[in-house]
Amino acid sequence: MAGVPPYGMHSPTQQPRYPSYSPSTRDRQPYSGNDPYQHPPRTPPSFAPPSSLSRSPHFARPPSPMNTTLPPLNGTVVNADGSPPYHGHSGSATSGYTLPRPFGGSLMSATSHSPPPSYSHASGSHSHPSNIPDSFSQSPKRESEPYDVRSDRTGPVSQTPARPASPKESKSARSNPMSFANILSGPADEPPPRRSSPPPQTYKSSTLPPIAPTPKVDKEPLSEPEKRRGSSHYETAYNEMPHRPAMNGFTPAKSPLAAMPSPLSKSRKLVDEEEIDKISRENIARALEQIDALDNSDVEAPGFEQEWERYMAKSRKRARELDAIEGRKRKRRRTEFLGKLAKMFEKQALQGIERFNRIHEAEVQMEVQQKEIQEEKERKKDMQRKRRRENTVRHEMEKLNAAQKKANKIEDEAEKQKLAKEIARSKKKIKDTTLALERGEASQEISEVNPLAPNLEGGTTSSFHIRTKSPPPPKKRAAKGTSSRPRKSKEKKQAEKDAAEAAYAAMENEDLVPLAPKEDPRKTSLKKESKAARSKEPSPVPATPYDSKGYNQFYEQLWRDIARKDIPKVYRIKVVSLSTRQENLRKTAQLAAKQARKWQEKTNRSMKDTQARAKRTMREMMTFWRRNEREERDMRRLAQRQELELAKKAEADREANRQRRKLNFLISQTELYSHFIGRKIKTDKAQDSGDATTTAAIEGNGEGKVPDSLVPLPDGGAKVTSFDDLDFDAEDETALRQAAMANAQSAVQEAQDRARAFNGEENKMADFDEGEMNFQNPTSLGDVEVSQPKMLTCQLKEYQLKGLNWLVNLYEQGINGILADEMGLGKTVQSISVMAYLAEVHDIWGPFLVVAPSSTLHNWQQEIVKFVPDLKVLPYWGSAKDRKVLRKFWDRRNITYRKQSEFHVLVTSYQLVVGDAQYFQKIKWQYMILDEAQAIKSSQSSRWKSLLGMHCRNRLLLTGTPIQNNMQELWALLHFIMPTLFDSHDEFSEWFSKDIESHAQSNTKLNEDQLKRLHMILKPFMLRRIKKHVQKELGDKVEKDVFCDLTYRQRAYYTSLRNRVSIMDLIEKAAIGDDTDSTTLMNLVMQFRKVCNHPDLFERAETTSPFSVCYFAETASFVREGPFVDVGYSTRNLVEYDLPRLLCSPEGRLDVAGPGNNKAGFEGRYLSHLMNIWTPENIRESMSHNDAFSWLRFADTSVGEAYEVSHKGVFERAVRRRDYSTRLSLLDVAYDAEDGVNINSVHVHSLFNIVERNDRRALADITATGYMRELLNVASNVAERGGIRTIEPCAKPGASAPPITISCSGQAAIAEARATFFNTAVRHALFAAPTKAMEEEILSNKLDPAPYSLRPLLPQPGSMKGRYTNITVPSMRRFVTDSGKLAKLDELLRELKNGGHRVLLYFQMTRMIDLMEEYLTYRNYKYCRLDGSTKLEDRRDTVSDFQQRPEIFVFLLSTRAGGLGINLTAADTVIFYDSDWNPTIDSQAMDRAHRLGQTKQVTVYRLITRGTIEERIRKRALQKEEVQRVVISGGAAGGVDFNARSRENRTKDIAMWLADDEQAEILEQKEKEALEKGEELGAKKGRKAAGKRKRDITLDDMYHEGEGHFEDNSTKPSGAATPVSGDVSGVPGVKGRRGRGGGGVGRSKKAKTMKERLRLVDGEVD
């Protein structure tokens, strides 16, 4: 019901405060928040006003306090009937109904999620459902009616049923949101018009409308619902009052007649209906007559016009004022109410959102993820489709060009036309593909669709659908007969039925139905015949079927033939026809659709083309301007960049000139110093040892040089200028040259002063004249000639004597030096001779300090004692307590020791010098000798700094390889010997390490001038001789590279490793310089080298054995069992036969007599003796009568033997027969026959003999030749040919188990089993194994064991040839062939063994040495081993054994452990199984054999795997050797390719080793191109700031895992390090630090040692 009920009976001044709330009774849709406790307070409507007030003209109907068009708060649509969603409230000040309790039990829903009972009558609007009648009114003082909470409604207990909807009120389209009109209309459509209402009535203010006479109403009898309604407690007049439609949101007042209570309402049931009608008609007629009789009414009387107008004006004014006041109040109330409602709705909405999110969050996330994955897949598909189209366009363009060229050359017209077709086809394909590329999707073809239903305007939609990938929408049934298929008429349907009946009739007549067309005359005739037959015979008479056996068989045969042959054929024809027809119809429909669309395409194409052209023009214009702006911006940036580059270049040139002047100053200063010192100590003369090439080179280097005497020198009082105070920006270099001369003179003077002041008054150098030590006469002090000291027990060679002179001159000048003779030329003897010279000539007996690697400490001690017995040697090593005792012999009071001193020479290691530095620095040492000085190659190490702080007069460095890796190491040695001259300037360091090496990166020649200057600087401080120049009697050294190939297993491993890593990514990461990547690269290098050495370094072949299905012996503790545990016969099968104890006891045995078995004795007596036929008496009687035993005389058996045999078992008879021999072979001797004639004997012994007269032999002995002999004598043949008695079986069983035994709990069964298994006599007879007691008896009685050693009855088992085991050990033959290197080494060692050579075999990995030991054992080669784990005392004995025992063929050594301080001249062959990346390490190792004392030619073999990382490492080592030759030896620098890389690119260099030749060539080419553009390969723009770099992990640590630290690069203890018996931790000054850099126990998990890291990589750590 629309509108609100009438207001209460109040005066116009007493308007209701709150209008009544009456929601619509239409069906409402349920929504959240519609629970009863959420409804606003509802007030019942007030009573209807009286008729006088209703009809009063002063009564103005105020508008509804609620806005009728208030939008819904939760987004739902408004009511379909146009009624306002929120209706007015009652005008009473207090609510007539009590508010529903929000938490009451009667109105609360069953569950918090289930809808309340009122949801059964849901409303379509936003108002809350209510079943209170619209006309319900109640007094404000009246108590509210109780609510009835039921399953379908909520309201008062007694309630009038709702008024049914009017038949004229139809449900609008708006009320159905799924209607076609709602779907087609947009969200902004106007609301549908409300249902029709009567036009508004206008009232005149001057005159009142006349009252019409009361019409006659014929009352009809009340219906049953009206009766029920009348029986309610509401007034009948009000219930029966007709409802008028609302106008402007108000409900008009009731008519006076309707409002007045009828006097007959109380007695309606008592009065008859006829009397009521009669009284009503009479009253009405009487009232009409009275009205007609009146002339004028009171209202129509004149004279009240002005009063009426004044009254009406005041009424209108008052009404307007009241409306305004009420409007403001109403607005305020509405605002307040809506605010509360909005807050409540907002709270409910938020709770609903949270609840919805909580429920559907996971589902939404999954859906979004799936959507993203699907979008990513679609994007990839689009990219693939785009690439395919681009490739298609490119291929078609190539085909098009080729076809055009071919068409231009061909003259044949037919070929030209054919090519023209191909060209047109290619152009079309290119065009289509290009259009598809521009559109970004495939061409969409127009699909045929069914016509749509008519829209709101009455027509059909004019748009055409384009076929897409999405499935077509489901077909809807069109309205008003506009379906896609035309409806059939009745005639057509009847015709189809007739046709079907005709076909059925034809089939009944056994006539085939022809496939006739649609209008076939045959079909028409059939129809007519069927109709005529149907008309003539409306009810056919049923025919009696003919039944016979032949007929039925023939009938069934016909149907089978038809079903087998004709029906499939007809079906196929029908299917083909149908498919052809459908195809034709489809094509026709497509053509028709295309034709129908042409008119639309013509109209839309021009507009689309215009828009497309405009967009394209705009796009091109924007592209042009963007490109133009970008070009201008790039030009500006290019100009700025060029300016910056020019400025940088100018600044770089200025800085280069400054650095050049600075470098020239340093070199000039060093050259002046070197020239003077070199002339005095005669380095050239010491180096000149008869080699013409070297002499010529030296002389050539001196050409064009100004003599020293002509060099202008400053005065002696010239001021020394500090390096920082010099001005290197000035163009004039005169001041720099003068400063260099002054500084050089000062350095010489300072060295002399320091040497003189070291010993004070005892200084022997005081005899020299100070005036001679200047640059004016540089040759005055070089005339000192030194002869060999007498106390030296050996004879020095010529070059060694020259070296002694050079060392003595260095000492007398107070200058330090480097003795860099090649290994094996006697550096140790020369340094010892210097100490002997000082003791003999200058009476300086010490103290001398010799620091050497721990592996050579014993060698130094032995050499000093051997060559100079007068010098006392103090070996300083051992525990902290031992060293403390040794320090008591130190004499700190005397600077110079005498002959009577406690010691003269102290020999110690680098490790202990650094550890006890505080004690060593308190003593002034006369001479400090550092052996293997490459140990201090790093100027940043604590060892270098500690040794530099020692107080010593002179320092001497001994090294065979002054340059190992780069020039930086040589500079560190020079800086150590001359700290003041070779100061740690960055420019000087860069010139040594960077300028020379980086010069060779471009593969150009080295600067000859700089190289000459370098040689000139090094000459005074370093003496270098080579073996081939100074030692003529020493044999040559021949180096050979032996290339090996990868085996199949190695190649598989190598390829697998290469496939797991990306070489390009590694090189790009290496360019960044990350420490983690460096460690990863080194690990990869290690893995690749392992593959090249032997694949068993990754995975060893396992020892296999059959699966043992048995129980093994168990013991609680092997400690209690003694040293030897015999567990023979302890295994038991898992399957055992359990027997009762009775069966295994004597009581259960029938043949064993006992107290429990009485029958056994009876049977033994009677059956075995009395009734036995084998008794002697019975046998003898039978033989006398020629009965049963008469055959014994032919068997040569007596009666006693027959009786004995019958009472013994098989085993006893076999043992007895073992000693007997047949006499058949004797007949051959007694009766010889001629050759070839077989004469049989006729004696009694051989009357029944059917075999030859020979003893029975084994079949293997009878067959002398043929295949049978080979098969029967396999074991003997193998033993004869192979020299071994074992044969490998062809197959191994998969499982093994001991025999199944009987299990019984009785002791008797156990004793019987033991007696059976371990019967001494039986075992001796079967296996010929004498017992222990028998052997002791034979030995004690000194008997001959031959009679007691009988032939065993059982032959040797077959398992003895396989050594009684099924355990399979990995084949050593396969072990050798699995590695290409090992296979090549096997051949090489065989040749060397036959040639009488002895071999030194060097390895990089100790695990490979373990494998090599297995190989040498397999080949029976005698060997000895020395690696990092060898103790010092064992090391000395091992070297001595190899030198003195010629039968030792191979010496296994680790390159680092066996390459220092060892004399192994007994070997003449050196084999490097894997080369070191540092060539100097290999040179030291091979010089262990190629040194003084070697009389044979030394051959060096280097095994290299072809095409692997080893080949590239070898190339890199050759480049390093070339650096040493050029820099140190003074050779020509032409064509030298250092191919050196800077320190930053070391990781990239390692990564290049992993690439093959093609990849390396590509990478080098890319790097060159990148360098030309000014950018580095693989470098990224945004590099992170490098923090503290971790400790560099060198390849030395990676390669030499498990070896000792013989170079003492760290304080880690080693088995081959300094022989410390106690704790090294007792060294003062070296405390266990925690944290970074500390070697304490508290190492974190990340701070793993290199060995642990490698084990982790190799998979050896769990």
Curated annotation (Swiss-Prot):
Residue runs in coiled coils: 356-439, 581-671
Positions of region (Disordered): 1-269, 373-548, 685-710, 1574-1662
Domain Helicase ATP-binding positions: 808-980
Biased composition (Basic and acidic residues): 140-153, 216-229, 390-399, 408-425, 517-537, 1592-1610, 1649-1662
Disulfide bonds: none
Keyword Hydrolase: yes
Catalyzed reactions: ATP + H2O = ADP + phosphate + H(+)
Localization, UniProt: Nucleus
Enzyme class (EC, first level): hydrolase
Extent of Basic residues compositional bias: 474-491, 1580-1591
Residue ranges occupied by any DBINO domain in the UniProt entry: 558-683
Gene3D superfamilies assigned to the protein according to its UniProt record, in alphabetical order: P-loop containing nucleotide triphosphate hydrolases, Tandem AAA-ATPase domain
Principal place of residence: nucleus
GO cellular component: Ino80 complex
MF terms in GO: ATP binding; ATP hydrolysis activity; ATP-dependent chromatin remodeler activity; DNA binding; histone binding
Motif (DEAQ box): 931-934
Residues at which ATP binds: D821, E822, M823, G824, L825, G826, K827, T828
Domain Helicase C-terminal: 1384-1544
Biased composition (Polar residues): 11-24
EC id: 3.6.4.-
Record's function text: ATPase component of the INO80 complex which remodels chromatin by shifting nucleosomes and is involved in DNA repair.
Family: Belongs to the SNF2/RAD54 helicase family.
Subunit structure and binding partners: Component of the INO80 chromatin-remodeling complex.
UniProt-listed PANTHER family: CHROMATIN-REMODELING ATPASE INO80 (PTHR45685:SF2), HELICASE SRCAP-RELATED (PTHR45685)
Comment on protein domains: The DBINO region is involved in binding to DNA.
Name of the molecule in the record: Chromatin-remodeling ATPase INO80
Organism: Coccidioides immitis (strain RS) (Valley fever fungus)
